């Protein structure tokens, strides 16, 4: 009967049955007959129509064998399927459904031996599987997903409900089989198809096998995985050996021998070794998931990873920890970083963007703050790591983080509770602690974002973006603040949805701390061995801080402290020694034109890659230092009752002088001497002591910076400081070197009152320092020594160095000769000149208008700027005085400022105020061709003297032409105080205008009487007392040598204002103490006009500066047409 049945079978069934060897029931490791299997494969290849019948027959036979527990027959069936797949991979779609049905029957058998035998077949199926077939047949798709899910469930570490518990070795075998199947799926092309739900099945099972409370175990697994990869990738370079010389640790197949622990260790050690092997397999599976070159294969597993971590957080597992140094660490961070390193370089940024997307889209409540903190810690760890995130949009990430900050500070409750630094205990306090922790982590994320710099101005753009959010809207701007602080760049501030983000105090503090973190991360090794490293980016320019000085007067003390901390960090990290060199901004345009002409030929040779435009040279002029010193002045008077605020100002002033040198001192010295005069207007004795400490602390800083300790001014300053400190007339914390910002107390909080002797308060006085001219001379001398001491480095090729000085153009680089190492005359005049807050505001407004005009057109807008900044002859006043002090004139003036000679013919750019007939005549004559050879001969022979710089009231200016060689920017020397001409200007109309615009005020009191205490404590102090001079104050003969501490003036002190209002300026007088401004010396620009020998003149500059005037006009004027400035 059996013989007849065999003869009636189809041929494909006969060939299949011949592949099964004769075995007993329950036999394992059975293999098919090789010759019959080869013939079966040939038969299926030659007759493709039979391959579907073969698959159906194997499916029916497997069902019978599984039911009767014929393990050997099942193993033979699985091997036949694997051979068919490998032999005819193109024919797999014909019998793929049969393969999945057979695998599903094996998985339902719950026999570990059958399941382990099915792994090679499933691996061959995944390698040759066509992913497009999954989208074509939904029934086949569901069948495939079911098989994958069953295999993945085998790797679970959690016991399945309703099933018997397996022993430890058997459980490890089940997990190993499941991970092998997962690795097969992860390495196939099916993951790149539309079946994204597979990640939700595979990734959690992989992570379960990697989960451990000891994160160091991950490092061990990673080392083993990397070692295995190195062995696989290493070329076969060993010498061939005979079988007799085979190593005892290797088998003939080249596989490593068994671990000695398996033989020598206990059962516990063997289980640990098996756990480690499973961990290595799980890590290989995770690596295979992320290494695929597909962006979807990076996005989807990242979401699955974040969901698994979220589940662990819900189970109160500690996935993120903090080490002893305060850095985040833990299992979640290590797995997240490993996944980022395994992903393709071009797709790594997808992992970060996915994490930020999940973070920002998650609801923000007190219940899920742990999830936010965990993900923020993971993002911060990835940002500060060395993982390259090519393609990352830094500004988009920054805006998302700022938007999440906004959501955090706008949560229900008191946002100021996040300002508390101490950790509190309790239900509500615990939620507040979680909020503070999340805010701190978001600040870290913003700072760590600076690790990845992909273009030169990225750090500047990041800081400017944050500072832009700090600027208030127009209705809430301070009425007297800088125009830079009021205007918004192209309306971006008003269009941004984050405009109200920093309206809260806690948001301002967080933003400023984030800026500090950016600067710390962007310049990690700024000062090693006293120098700066070369950065592959541009340094943050000073223009970035324009319009932020109002933060120094914020009502909240922590905001003021955070702002000073950010500015001090910027000075520490972003400035170079070249920034302390004097940079004459008034002559910047002339230097640019001259340097452009000299380097024109050299620039033609430079390649296009090297001819990078220097942005610092084209950057608009910054008024930040002027307005910052103005804010310091207002801050000192507004918060005079708080010593911490004055110490904070001292730290800021000291850092400005230390890093910027004379570039900061030219604004700080006039302001500090004005503040010294205002000491007498302070009501309380403690307030006078505090302001006096700030003033002398700044002078102390100048003497240390420019090495003036051994000079007479330095001795006088140090002597007065010693005297005040000996009598407790000093603020604790104003020292040199200045303390760190972190060591300064909270501004706005009063300290305990100092212990002062009331008798000393009634009898002593504060000696002001009036030797201003000698101090400026010492600073100039010290600057010249500092400028000549460091060796100059050779110049680099143009355009290849991104490290530009942050103060301005590189055209004014290291001085070349001895004269250029001196302090410019404009700097000296600024340091010796007068200072008022109205003049500072007017100058900055005029400078901003000029910058806008120079960057715009040459038409009507430039005329409007000049009309706003120049004064007419009708006596209209401005904070700077009359227009007779604004531009030089070639005709001498009389004692009262009236022009003695005929009106000077203007240059092409000079204009008379409007369309007057005289103006038309001058322009017509200026446009006529004239001969200036006689003037040139006079200059070459030495008979032509430079014209005086006095200004006539009829001086007129034109700005409707661009052909003039005179610099359009106003030089500081044209606005400064001229002691030589002060006597002749007392009655001039230009000076009476300033006197009329300001009420009288008291200046330094008359130094004619001795103080009630004894002689000076140091020899240098006597020179200050004996050499002090000045005009009598408003109290007449009642004044003494110093400012009395216990005496209060009849005029009340200006009331403190909020951050959005400015202090009323103390009333001033038109008569100033000449001794306190410039001593008895004449200004540097008046030496040539007093009969001294004029300096050598540049012939090239003179030829360009010859005025277009006739010879008769030259002879009638008796001098050149205009000075060659």
UniProtKB/Swiss-Prot annotation:
A Pfam family reported for this protein in Swiss-Prot or TrEMBL: EFR3
Gene Ontology biological-process entries: protein localization to plasma membrane
Membrane-crossing segments per the record: none
Annotated stretches, region: Disordered: 240-261, 471-493, 788-819, 845-1093
This protein's GO CC annotations: plasma membrane
Signal sequence bounds: none
Domain of life: Eukaryota
Database matches in InterPro entries: ARM-type_fold, EFR3, EFR3_HEAT-like_rpt
Ranges of Low complexity composition bias in the record: 788-798, 855-877
Polar residues biased stretches: 242-252, 845-854, 878-896, 975-1011, 1046-1071
PANTHER family for the chain: PROTEIN EFR3 (PTHR47766:SF1)
Family affiliation: Belongs to the EFR3 family.
Protein name as annotated: Protein efr-3
């Amino acid at each position: 009967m059996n013989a007849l049945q065999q003869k009636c079978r189809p041929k494909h069934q006969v060939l299949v049955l011949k592949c099964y060897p004769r075995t007993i029931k329950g036999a394992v490791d059975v293999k098919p007959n090789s010759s019959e299997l080869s013939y079966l494969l040939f038969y299926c290849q030659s007759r493709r129509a039979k391959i579907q019948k073969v698959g159906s027959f194997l499916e029916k036979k497997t069902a019978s064998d599984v039911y009767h527990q014929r393990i050997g027959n099942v193993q033979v069936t699985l091997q036949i399927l694997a051979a068919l797949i490998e032999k005819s991979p193109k024919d797999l779609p014909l019998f793929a459904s049969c393969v999945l049905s057979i695998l599903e029957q094996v998985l339902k058998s719950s026999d570990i031996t059958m399941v382990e035998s099915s792994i090679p077949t499933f691996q061959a199926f995944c390698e040759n599987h066509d992913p497009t077939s999954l989208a074509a047949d939904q029934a086949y798709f569901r069948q495939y997903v079911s098989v994958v899910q069953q295999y993945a469930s085998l790797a679970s570490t959690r016991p399945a409900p309703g099933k018997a518990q397996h022993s430890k070795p058997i459980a490890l075998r089940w997990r190993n089989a499941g991970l092998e199947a997962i690795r097969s799926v992860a390495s196939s092309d099916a993951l790149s198809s539309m079946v994204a739900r597979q990640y939700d099945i595979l990734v959690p099972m992989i992570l379960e096998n990697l989960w451990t409370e000891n994160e160091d175990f991950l490092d061990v697994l990673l080392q083993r995985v990397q070692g295995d990869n190195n062995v696989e990738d290493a070329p076969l370079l060993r010498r061939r050996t005979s079988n007799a010389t085979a190593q005892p640790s290797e088998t003939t197949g080249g596989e490593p021998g068994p671990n000695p622990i398996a033989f020598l260790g206990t059962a516990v050690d063997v289980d640990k070794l098996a756990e480690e092997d499973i961990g290595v397999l799980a890590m290989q599976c995770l690596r295979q998931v992320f290494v695929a070159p597909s962006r979807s294969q990076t996005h989807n597993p990242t979401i699955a990873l974040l969901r698994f971590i979220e589940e662990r957080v819900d189970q109160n597992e500690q996935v993120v920890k903090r080490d002893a140094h305060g850095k985040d660490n833990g299992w979640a961070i290590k797995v997240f970083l490993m996944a980022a390193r395994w992903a393709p370089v071009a797709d790594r940024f997808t992992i970060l963007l996915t994490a930020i997307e999940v973070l920002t889209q998650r609801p923000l409540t007190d219940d899920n703050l742990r999830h936010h903190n965990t993900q923020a810690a993971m993002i911060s760890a990835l940002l500060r790591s060395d993982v390259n995130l090519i393609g990352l949009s830094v500004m988009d990430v920054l805006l998302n983080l700022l938007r999440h900050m906004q959501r955090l500070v706008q949560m229900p409750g008191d946002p100021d509770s996040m300002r508390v630094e101490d950790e509190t205990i309790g239900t509500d306090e615990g939620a507040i602690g979680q909020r503070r922790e999340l805010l701190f982590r978001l600040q870290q994320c913003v700072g760590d974002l600076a690790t990845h710099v992909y273009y030169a101005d990225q750090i500047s753009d990041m800081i400017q973006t944050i500072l832009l959010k700090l600027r208030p809207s127009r209705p809430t701007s301070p009425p007297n603040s800088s125009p830079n602080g009021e205007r918004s760049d192209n309306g971006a501030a008003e269009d941004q949805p984050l405009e109200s983000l920093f309206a809260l105090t806690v948001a301002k503090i967080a933003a400023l701390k984030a800026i500090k973190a950016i600067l710390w991360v962007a310049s990690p090794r700024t000062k090693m061995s006293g120098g700066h490293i070369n950065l592959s980016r541009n340094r943050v320019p000073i223009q970035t801080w324009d319009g932020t000085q109002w933060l120094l007067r914020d009502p909240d003390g922590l905001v003021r402290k955070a702002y000073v901390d950010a500015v001090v960090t910027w000075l520490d990290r972003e400035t170079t020694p070249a920034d302390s060199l004097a940079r004459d901004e008034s002559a910047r345009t002339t230097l640019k034109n001259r340097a452009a002409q000299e380097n024109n030929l050299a620039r033609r040779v430079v390649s296009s890659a090297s001819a990078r435009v220097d942005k610092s040279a084209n950057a608009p002029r910054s008024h930040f230092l002027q307005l910052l010193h103005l804010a310091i002045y207002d801050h000192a008077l507004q918060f005079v009752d708080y010593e911490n605020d004055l110490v904070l100002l001292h730290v800021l002033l000291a850092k400005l002088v230390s890093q910027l040198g004379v570039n900061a001192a030219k604004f700080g010295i006039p302001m500090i001497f004005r503040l010294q005069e205002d000491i007498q207007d302070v009501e309380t004795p403690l307030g006078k002591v505090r302001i006096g400490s700030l003033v002398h602390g700044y002078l102390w800083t100048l003497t240390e910076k420019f090495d003036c300790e051994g000079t007479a001014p330095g001795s006088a300053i140090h002597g007065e400081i010693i005297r005040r400190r000996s009598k407790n007339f000093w603020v604790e914390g104003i020292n040199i070197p200045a303390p760190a910002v972190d060591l300064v107390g909270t501004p706005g909080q009063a300290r305990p009152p100092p212990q002062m002797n009331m008798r000393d308060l009634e009898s002593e006085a504060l000696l002001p320092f009036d030797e201003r001219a000698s101090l400026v001379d010492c600073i100039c001398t010290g600057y010249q020594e500092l400028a000549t001491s460091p060796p100059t480095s050779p110049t680099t090729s143009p355009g290849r160095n991104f490290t530009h000085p942050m103060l301005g153009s590189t055209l004014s680089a290291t001085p070349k000769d001895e004269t250029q190492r001196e302090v410019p005359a404009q700097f000296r005049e600024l340091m010796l000149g007068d200072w008022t807050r109205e003049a500072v505001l007017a100058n900055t407004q005029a400078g901003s208008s000029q910058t806008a005009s120079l960057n715009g057109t040459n038409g009507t807008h430039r005329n409007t700027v000049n009309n706003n900044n120049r004064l007419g002859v009708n006596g209209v006043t401005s904070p700077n005085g009359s227009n007779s002090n604004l531009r030089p004139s070639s005709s001498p003036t009389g004692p009262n400022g009236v022009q003695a000679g005929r009106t000077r013919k203007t240059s092409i750019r000079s204009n008379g105020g409007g369309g007057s007939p005289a103006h038309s005549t001058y322009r017509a004559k200026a446009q006529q061709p004239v001969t200036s050879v006689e003037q040139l001969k006079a200059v070459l022979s030495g008979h032509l003297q430079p014209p005086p710089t006095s200004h006539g009231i009829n001086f007129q200016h034109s700005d409707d032409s661009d052909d003039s060689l005179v610099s359009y920017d106003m030089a500081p020397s044209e606005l400064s105080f001229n002691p030589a001409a002060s006597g002749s200007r007392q009655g001039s109309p230009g000076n009476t205008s300033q006197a009329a615009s300001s009420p009288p005020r008291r200046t330094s009191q008359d130094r004619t009487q001795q103080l009630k205490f004894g002689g000076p404590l140091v020899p240098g102090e006597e020179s200050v007392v004996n050499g002090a001079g000045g005009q009598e104050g408003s109290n007449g003969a009642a004044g003494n040598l110093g400012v009395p501490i216990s005496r209060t003036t009849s005029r009340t002190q200006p009331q403190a204002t909020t951050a959005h209002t400015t202090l009323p300026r103390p009333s001033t007088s038109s008569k100033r103490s000449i001794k306190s401004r410039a001593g008895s010396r004449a200004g540097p620009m008046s030496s040539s006009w007093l009969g001294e020998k004029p300096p050598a003149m540049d012939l090239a500059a003179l030829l360009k500066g010859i005025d277009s005037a006739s010879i008769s006009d030259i002879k009638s004027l008796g001098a050149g047409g205009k000075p060659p400035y």
